[in-house]
Each structure stands twice: as structure tokens, then as C-alpha cells.
UniProtKB/Swiss-Prot annotation:
Lineage: Eukaryota, Fungi, Dikarya, Ascomycota, Pezizomycotina
PANTHER family membership: GLUCOSE TRANSPORT TRANSCRIPTION REGULATOR RGT1-RELATED-RELATED, ZN(II)2CYS6 TRANSCRIPTION FACTOR (EUROFUNG)
Gene Ontology CC entries for this record: nucleus
Residue spans of biased composition, Polar residues class: 59-69
GO molecular function term, any single one: DNA-binding transcription factor activity, RNA polymerase II-specific
InterPro entries membership: Carb_Metab_Trans_Reg, Zn2-C6_fun-type_DNA-bd_sf, Zn2Cys6_DnaBD
Compartment(s) where it occurs, according to its Swiss-Prot or TrEMBL record: Nucleus
Function: Transcription factor that regulates the expression of the gene cluster that mediates the biosynthesis of the phytotoxin stemphyloxin II.
Portion annotated as DNA-binding: 15-45
Stated name of the protein: Stemphyloxin II biosynthesis cluster transcription factor sthR
Major place of residence: nucleus
Ranges that cross the membrane: none
PROSITE patterns xrefs: ZN2_CY6_FUNGAL_1, ZN2_CY6_FUNGAL_2
Length: 427
């Protein structure tokens, strides 16, 4: 059995190589002071001062800039405080305790970040620009291959470019070139589209909660309420068409968001820009809400006209005709249109024209169209992949929308039937 030899060796006298391996130097050393382990390895044996481990004492940090070591005549600089490291040229208020010593708190780190006004006034230096631009950059941008479908603003496509990293006012023109007018226009259209979708939802909810029923239990709305709802819905439909034109042709969106005739309605034959998936959902939701609203309103209008038709045949006076006005403000060649059948025919033609425009700009297939237009140019905003999903949903009769709107496939077929009924009744 071999004997174990013990020898007294101070840990602080171990060389750097032995200390790194968590060993102690063997007692045999040559004339140069090289330990046996380093001598056998053929490497230089060096002994440095061991660094203290653990967190330094807070009260051991001197705040006057110098600290005197007892027993020595030299002065060494004090260790830097966290505030001096974090400041990096930025000025911040220094908290002073009652005894006059400087205290540091983690909350002071927020004071080192510049305010939002500094970004606008261009108060940041070039080095600070690069540091803060690094906060917005991530290597995941290249790994995930993010595109406009995940980031509508396009800010993630250039992970760390010099244009995005600059926050000074002198580079605003360069930033505006990166954020193209088309991108800003898409953001503006998305915001207006969300507002329009919310307005259509409110209109649907308000109309479905009108508690007007007849003695037999059928739903009846007064004709003046139907006329007001039709006017609001036509205005929202025109606003939706205007947004579609802006997204399709890249034109500017008016402040009121209303549709104007000078905008070109002809296709350029060029594929429209790819939209973000939330924008596609907003477009789809707005279209089918418009379909459902027109379906309910025209169904109520057909019921109202069927109720007033026997009264008109029995009465030769114009009191009944004047009482029932679908479009009371409608004028033709400067003259007010009083005939109900003519108002109905003009209303159906207007709705048909609006649906033809919406379906052409969206690129809907024939089985999802309300109008009889067969123009399938394949350059719609929704894209072929999404329209194929909608077509498969039509075949499987999936339901979209909120609780009382019903099946959107049924709404399309019912709207076609109601428009046909009103067209025959107005002849």
C-alpha cells in the first residue's frame, strides 16, 4: 500500500497554470523557480496576483477619485462605479447621501436613456446612434427570413442598416426614402380599413337590435329607418371601394376616406402588392359584412314594398307614394325622383355596380360574387391562395362573422335572390 505524502504549500504561491487546473505546485522547483509540472510540460511558469472572487464591497468603493493604500506611498485610482460605466458620456443627476458619499441605485439606469425628444431633435451622437440601433437589431431577422407578411411596416427587413440606425434630423430625408410612400400609404389604408370594419360591425349590431315585429311575428322595420340605414351603408361601401383603389393603384387616401370618380378604375395588368395577413382578413371581413347588411336591408325593403303594393293599387292618391321613400334625396337631372319603382331600380343598379367593382378589385372567383360579372383577371388584392380557401369554405359552408349574421354563403345567395326580386318588382 503506497503511502500518501503531504506537503505544506500556500495556495497563493501556486503558478498560474496550476491554479487554472485547480492544482497546487509540486515542491520540486529548479533554480529559476519553475515548478515541476510546468518544467515537465515545457512551458513558462508565471505567478500572478490572484484576483478576488465574489462581489466587491459597496463601502469599499471610494468616491473621491483616489484611495490611499496603507503602508504604501503610492495612490491608485478608485474602482469605477456603475454610474460611471453606464453614463458613457450621458449626463445624469448624482444622488448624494446625508454623509456626503455617492450612492447608486439600479433605477438610475433609466436616467441614462435619452428621452424621446432627443430622437426628434437629433441630440444623439454617432456612437450613441449605433448603440441604440443595436437594440432594434436581432440575428433572428435573417434566420426567420421575415417579410412584409409578418411586418407591414417593413422595419425588420433591414436588420442593422446605417439609415435605420440614424436618428438625427439631418438624415430624415434618408429615412423617408427607406420608409417609402407606398409603405406609409399601406399603413394609412390599414388604419382606415380597421375603422371601417368597426363601423360596419356597429351598424350591423344596431340594425339587428331594432325590436319591430308585426302581429304574426315577422320582423318589420319602418321605411324611414331602412332608408337611413341604406344611405349609411352606401357611404361605407363607397369608402371601402376607395380604400381598395388606394391599395390597388397606390394612390393617396383622402382625409375623409370617401370614394371619388377621378380615380382610375381600369386594371393596369400588373400584380398588386402583397398585403399583410391582417389586412387580408380586414378586407374579407368588410366585404362579407357589407354583403350581410345589404341582404338584411334589401330583404326588409322587399317586405315593405310588398306591404305597400296593395295600398297603392287601392288608392289613387299620392299620399302612400310620398310616405314610402327609399331614397328621398335622390335626384335625376336636377329633378327629385318620387316614384318608388324608379328609386328601387336605381338602388339595385347602384348596389350591383358597387359589388362589381369590389369583386374585381378583390379578385373574387365567380362562386363568391354577388354580381353576374365574369371578369376574372387574376390580379386581385386577396390573392389566389386566399380566394381558394374561401371557395373551399363556401363548399363546406363555413360560417364567418358574429352570432346573428348567419352563414356568409347563405347571405350571398339570399342577396342575389333579393336583388332579383326587387328588380322584377320595379319593372
Amino acid at each position: 500500500m503506497s503511502t500518501i505524502s503531504f506537503f505544506a504549500t500556500s495556495k497563493r504561491t501556486s503558478c498560474d497554470r496550476c491554479r487554472k487546473q485547480k492544482l497546487r505546485c509540486p515542491p520540486d522547483k529548479d533554480d529559476m523557480g519553475t515548478c515541476g509540472r510546468c518544467l515537465r510540460a515545457g512551458v513558462a511558469c508565471a505567478t500572478s496576483y490572484t484576483k478576488p472572487r465574489g462581489r466587491s464591497q459597496k463601502h469599499g468603493i471610494s468616491t473621491d477619485g483616489t484611495s490611499h493604500v496603507s503602508g504604501l506611498d503610492m495612490q491608485e485610482p478608485a474602482l469605477p462605479t456603475p454610474e460611471s460605466v453606464l453614463s458613457a458620456g450621458l449626463t445624469s443627476s448624482v444622488q448624494v447621501a446625508e454623509d456626503g458619499s455617492q450612492l447608486w441605485s439600479p433605477l438610475e439606469e433609466y436616467n441614462h436613456l435619452p428621452s424621446l425628444s432627443n430622437f426628434e431633435s437629433g441630440a444623439l451622437s454617432q456612437s450613441q446612434d449605433e448603440d441604440f440601433a443595436g437594440l432594434w437589431w436581432s440575428p433572428l431577422h435573417e434566420d426567420l427570413d421575415l417579410d412584409v407578411h409578418m411586418d407591414p411596416s417593413g422595419a425588420c427587413q433591414n436588420g442593422y442598416s446605417a439609415e435605420i440606425s440614424s436618428f438625427s434630423r439631418t438624415d430624415c430625408s434618408r429615412q423617408s426614402n427607406d420608409c417609402s410612400p407606398e409603405t406609409l400609404q399601406h399603413v394609412e389604408c390599414d388604419m382606415r380599413l380597421s375603422q371601417l370594419n368597426l363601423e360596419l360591425c356597429r351598424q350591423s349590431k344596431a340594425y339587428h337590435h331594432w325590436p319591430n315585429t308585426t302581429s304574426d311575428g315577422s320582423v318589420r322595420r319602418p321605411h324611414f329607418a331602412i332608408a337611413s340605414a341604406l344611405r349609411d351603408l352606401l357611404q361605407n361601401t363607397e369608402a371601402f371601394i376607395h380604400i381598395l383603389h388606394c391599395l390597388r393603384n397606390g394612390t393617396e387616401l383622402n382625409l375623409d376616406g370617401r370614394y371619388q370618380e377621378p380615380i382610375s378604375t381600369h386594371d393596369t395588368g400588373v400584380s398588386p402588392p402583397s398585403l399583410a395577413f391582417p389586412s387580408i382578413l380586414n378586407l374579407t371581413s368588410c366585404f362579407f359584412r357589407i354583403v350581410d347588411l345589404f341582404n338584411v336591408l334589401l330583404s326588409s325593403l322587399a317586405l315593405e314594398l310588398a306591404t305597400h303594393s296593395p295600398l297603392q293599387r287601392r288608392s289613387s292618391s299620392s299620399s302612400v307614394t310620398s310616405a314610402l321613400q327609399i331614397l328621398p334625396d335622390l335626384k335625376l337631372a336636377g329633378l327629385a325622383v318620387q316614384e318608388v319603382s324608379l328609386q328601387t331600380k336605381i338602388l339595385v343598379l347602384t348596389i350591383t355596380h358597387h359589388f362589381e367593382t369590389m369583386e374585381r378589385l378583390l379578385g373574387l372567383p365567380a362562386d363568391l360574387r354577388v354580381s353576374e360579372c365574369k371578369d376574372d383577371n387574376g390580379y386581385g388584392l386577396l390573392g389566389a391562395s386566399w380566394t381558394s380557401v374561401l371557395s373551399s369554405g363556401r363548399r363546406e359552408k363555413f360560417e364567418l362573422g358574429w352570432r346573428r349574421t348567419g352563414n356568409w354563403v347563405t347571405s350571398i345567395e339570399s342577396l342575389k335572390a333579393n336583388m332579383g326580386t326587387l328588380t322584377k318588382g320595379s319593372c
